[in-house]
Regions:
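Structured alpha-helical
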Residues: 1-108
Length: 108
């Protein structure tokens, strides 16, 4: 049986707390005010009180600045007594995120 290998990240994760707003939960509508645990140019690990399903679509917006993105839930892991860690892949980012991709032509 052939071995399967997980795809490797092209962007490094940086431990950073960024205040964000999450919305788009299918079961529990509304906006959740929360924070990231780490970030990259193409996504973030976010703490949530809600359990999300893999491939759910959500909207993430930074509380400071103009960043907003439609995202895909890559994973949702249970955290002890504090909710869930949600891996978010940015699908349609708009505005200035805290870190830019090395391939971003507008990067300074």
């Amino acid at each position: 049986m052939p071995k399967q290998f997980a795809a490797h990240r092209s962007d490094k994760r940086i431990p950073m707390e960024v205040a964000v707003l999450l919305s788009g939960h299918k079961v529990t509508p509304g906006i959740e005010s929360t924070f990231t645990e780490n970030v990259s140019a193409r996504g973030a690990r976010v703490v949530s009180v809600r359990r999300w399903d893999t491939n759910d679509r959500l909207t993430l917006a930074s509380r400071a600045g103009d960043f907003r993105a439609t995202g895909r839930v890559a994973y949702c892991q249970s955290l002890r007594e504090t909710g869930y860690a949600v891996g978010v892949e940015f699908l349609e980012p708009d505005g200035q995120w805290v870190i830019q991709s090395l391939s971003d032509p507008f990067r300074q």
